[in-house]
From Swiss-Prot:
InterPro entries: Glu_permease_IIB, PTrfase_EIIB_Cys, PTS_EIIC, PTS_EIIC_1, PTS_IIB_1, PTS_IIBC_sucr, PTS_maltose/Glc_sub_IIC, PTS_Sugar-Specific_Components. It comes from the Bacteria. The lineage of its organism: Bacteria, Pseudomonadati, Pseudomonadota, Gammaproteobacteria, Enterobacterales. This is PTS system sucrose-specific EIIBC component. The active site is at C26 (phosphocysteine intermediate). It holds the Pfam family PTS_EIIB. The gene is scrA. The chain crosses the membrane at residues 112-132, 144-164, 181-201, 213-233, 247-267, 288-308, 329-349, 360-380, 388-408, 428-448.
Length: 456
C-alpha cells in the first residue's frame, strides 16, 4: 500500500491543503477538522485505496483506515498537506467550535468520564467476580482474600467524587488537584457514608439551618456541579489576587469558598438531581418493562450518530453509585444495540460481491461485536441504509429481552462480548441470549432486505 499516494489522492477530495485546519488520529481513524466541510467529497473519499469508511462526527471528518494502517497514513498525510502534527486534544478543541450545545455537553462529559472508566471497569469486574463467588459459595465471605478483594472492588466507587473532581477541574479550566480536594471534602470521614445512611445519620446546625451530614461516595452530579463552581471561583480569584500572593491565597480561598458552598447548597442539590434522574429511569424500566428496552435499544444507535451517547457515562455512574439502585441497567441495552450493528454488518458480507466491501465488512462486524461500532455504522450500515434499519430492529429486540429478564451490569464502559465480564453472575446466561437475539434478528433482517451492496 502506497501511503504517499493515498495522501495525495485524499487532499483534493478534502478541498485541498488550504481546507485542512488540523489533523490527528485515533486507533483506527484519521481525524480531520476542515475549514469548509462542504468542499469534501465523501463518496469519492470512500473509494480511495485503504479507506474503509468516511463520516462526519463531532465536528470532524473521520476516515477509517484500521489499526496499524492509520498511523502510516497520518504520517504521510501531514507531510503531503504541509501541516504540523496536532494532538487529539488540539484537534478536538478546534472541532468543538463546530458542535451544537448538546454535542458540546456530551463531549464535555465524555472527556470527564472516559479517563475514569478503567478504574470503574476494574472495580466492576471484581464486583462481578465476587458476586459469582458468593452466589455459588466458592469462598467464605469472612475469608481474608475475599475481604481484601471486596476492598479493591469498592475503592473506585468510594473515591469516585475525587476521581471526577480531578478530571472535571481539568476540563473546566481549574486546578485538577483542587478539584480532587473538593471531591475529598464531599467524601470526608466526618460525613456519614452514603451507603450507611439506613443505620442513621446526624445533622449539623449552621446558623439555624440543619445540614444533613451525609457523604457523597459514588455520586456524580454533586461533584460535577461543585467543581464547575470551584473553577469559576478559582479563575475569578486569580484575576483579582496579586501575583505575589496568588500561590497562597488563591487555592486557600478557592477551597474554603467552594467547600462551604458544595456542602451547604450544591451537594444537596446535585444529589437531588442525580436521585431524580435515577428515579425516573428506574421507574420507566420497572413500569414500561420490555417496551422501554425496545425503545432504548432501537434508538441507541441513532443517538450514537450524534455523539450525544458519551453523556450517558455520567448517568450510568450515578446509577451504580446510588445506594438504592447500585447496578447499571442501561448498559446491557446499549450492548444489544452494538451487537445488532455487528449482525447487520456481517449480513452485508454474505450479500455483496464487491471485493472492497467484503474486505471492510468482516473486520467492521467483528469490531462491533467487541463494542466498537463506528466502522460498522458509518462504513457499512449507514452507507447502505437498510442494514442500519435492520440493526435498529435487532437492537430493539435485544433491548426488550434484557429488560424483561432483568439483566444488570456492575460497571460502565464494556459492551457486547467484553461486557460479559461485568454482567452480574445471575444475569450472564440471559445476557448471552440477548446478544444472540440482537445479532440474529439484525443479521436476518439485513440479509432479507433488498439493497445494492457494491462500492458504487
Amino acid at each position: 500500500m502506497d501511503f504517499e499516494q493515498i495522501s495525495c489522492s485524499l487532499l483534493p477530495l478534502l478541498g485541498g491543503k488550504e481546507n485542512i485546519a488540523s489533523a490527528a488520529h485515533c486507533a483506527t481513524r484519521l481525524r480531520l477538522v476542515l475549514v469548509d466541510d462542504s468542499l469534501a467529497d465523501q463518496q469519492a473519499i470512500g473509494k480511495v485505496e485503504g479507506v474503509k469508511g468516511c463520516f462526519r462526527n463531532a465536528g470532524q471528518m473521520q476516515i477509517i483506515f484500521g489499526t496499524g494502517v492509520v498511523n502510516k497514513v497520518y504520517a504521510a498525510f501531514t507531510q503531503a498537506a504541509g501541516i504540523s502534527e496536532s494532538s487529539k486534544s488540539e484537534a478536538a478543541d478546534i472541532a468543538a467550535k463546530k458542535l451544537n450545545p448538546f454535542q458540546r455537553i456530551a463531549r464535555l462529559l465524555s472527556n470527564i468520564f472516559v479517563p475514569i472508566i478503567p478504574a470503574i471497569v476494574a472495580s466492576g469486574l471484581l464486583m462481578g467476580l465476587l458476586g459469582m463467588v458468593k452466589t455459588y459459595g466458592w469462598v467464605d465471605p469472612g475469608n481474608a482474600i475475599y475481604i481484601m478483594l471486596d476492598m479493591c472492588s469498592s475503592a473506585a466507587f468510594i473515591i469516585l467524587p475525587i476521581l471526577i473532581g480531578f478530571t472535571a477541574a481539568r476540563e473546566f479550566g481549574g486546578n485538577p488537584y483542587l478539584g480532587a480536594t473538593l471531591g475529598g471534602i464531599l467524601t470526608h470521614p466526618a460525613l456519614t457514608n452514603a451507603w450507611g445512611v439506613a443505620a442513621g445519620f446526624h445533622t449539623m446546625n449552621f446558623f439555624g439551618f440543619e445540614i444533613a451530614m451525609i457523604g457523597y461516595q459514588g455520586t456524580v452530579f454533586p461533584v460535577l456541579l461543585a467543581v464547575w463552581f470551584m473553577s469559576i471561583v478559582e479563575k475569578q480569584l486569580r484575576r483579582a489576587i496579586p501575583d505575589a500572593l496568588d500561590l497562597i491565597l488563591t487555592p486557600f480561598l478557592t477551597v474554603i469558598i467552594s467547600g462551604f458552598i458544595a456542602l451547604l447548597i450544591i451537594g444537596p442539590a446535585g444529589r437531588a438531581l442525580g436521585d431524580g434522574i435515577s428515579f425516573v429511569l428506574s421507574t420507566l424500566i420497572s413500569h414500561a418493562g420490555w417496551l422501554a428496552g425496545l425503545l432504548f435499544g432501537g434508538l441507541y444507535s441513532v443517538i450514537v450518530i450524534t455523539g450525544i451517547h458519551h453523556s450517558f457515562h455520567a448517568v450510568e455512574a450515578g446509577l451504580l453509585g446510588n445506594p438504592s439502585i447500585g447496578v447499571n441497567f442501561l448498559l446491557p441495552i446499549w450492548a444489544m444495540a452494538n451487537v445488532a450493528q455487528g449482525g447487520a454488518c456481517l449480513a452485508v458480507w454474505f450479500k455483496t460481491k464487491d471485493a472492497k466491501i467484503k474486505a471492510i465488512t468482516l473486520p467492521s462486524a467483528f469490531s462491533a461485536m467487541l463494542g466498537i461500532t463506528e466502522a460498522a455504522i458509518f462504513g457499512i450500515n449507514l452507507r447502505f441504509v437498510k442494514p442500519f434499519i435492520a440493526a435498529l430492529i435487532g437492537g430493539a429486540a435485544g433491548g426488550a429481552w434484557v429488560v424483561s429478564v432483568h439483566v444488570y451490569m456492575t460497571a460502565v464502559g464494556l459492551t457486547a462480548i467484553p461486557g460479559m465480564a461485568i454482567v452480574q453472575a445471575s444475569s450472564l446466561l440471559n445476557y448471552i441470549i440477548g446478544m444472540v437475539i440482537a445479532f440474529g434478528v439484525a443479521f436476518t433482517v439485513s440479509l432479507v432486505l433488498k439493497y445494492k451492496t457494491d462500492a458504487e
